[in-house]
């Protein structure tokens, strides 16, 4: 993308011990060299991470997923990318290591802007932690693009339970954006989505007008919420 010009590139592909996926009791832990296609082909993906299961076919094309890593996508922080959106919707956790030590950051605090995260330049992402499917919880993903596997015009990841709706929007804002609503206000979902759409700073671009994007939030966003509620 020509946004960086590093003087030194370190190849870590030979570090086989970081190509890992560990299925813990309530989380899935993913190592830094675990490829997106490996995650897509994981036999337990649908039962453990249903939101990621729904979203990962939209991630580029199969040759991209064969080479791209899960943590690479998370750390790149492209606002049109699907995996950062799921990371935020699930409020996962990323572990960063440097000479100063190890620290973890929740997804809520990780994205600062387009292609900008709170990872420092002297840190390496060593592990991603995602919470697995919970009882009485619904998950849904949806995306609108000019053609399948193209950059998203709008993407939606929703997690709902009996208490709240966690609505996450990608591509339209400059970074993945999340808002939570009390499930008691579900009957006002049209008004909530309309207010949310108008409170965003949305501009026309070569792909869609601001009016069209707001309409996507209201209509496709609502359909994604309804799908999530249906899955509870």
What are these regions (language model features)?
Residues 1-232:
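C-terminal structural segment of proteins
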């Amino acid at each position: 993308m020509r946004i960086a010009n590093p003087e030194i590139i370190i190849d870590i592909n030979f570090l086989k011990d970081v190509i890992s996926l560990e299925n813990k009791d309530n989380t899935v832990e993913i190592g830094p060299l675990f490829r997106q296609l490996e995650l897509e082909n994981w036999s337990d993906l649908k039962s453990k991470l249903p939101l990621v299961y729904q979203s990962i076919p939209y991630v580029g094309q199969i040759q991209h997923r064969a080479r791209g890593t899960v943590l690479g996508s998370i750390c790149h922080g492209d606002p049109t990318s699907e995996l950062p959106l799921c990371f935020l919707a699930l409020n996962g956790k990323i572990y960063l290591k440097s000479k100063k030590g190890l620290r973890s950051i929740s997804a809520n605090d990780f994205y600062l802007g387009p292609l900008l995260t709170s990872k420092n330049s002297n840190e390496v992402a060593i592990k991603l932690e995602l919470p697995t499917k919970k009882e009485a919880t619904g998950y849904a993903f949806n995306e609108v693009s000019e053609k399948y596997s193209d950059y998203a015009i709008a993407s939606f990841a929703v997690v709902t339970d009996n208490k709240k709706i966690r609505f996450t929007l990608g591509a339209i804002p400059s970074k993945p954006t999340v808002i939570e609503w009390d499930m008691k206000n579900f009957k006002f979902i049209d008004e909530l989505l309309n207010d949310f759409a108008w409170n965003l700073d949305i501009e026309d671009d070569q792909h869609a007008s601001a009016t069209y994007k707001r309409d996507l939030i209201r209509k496709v966003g609502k359909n994604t919420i309804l799908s999530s509620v249906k899955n509870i």
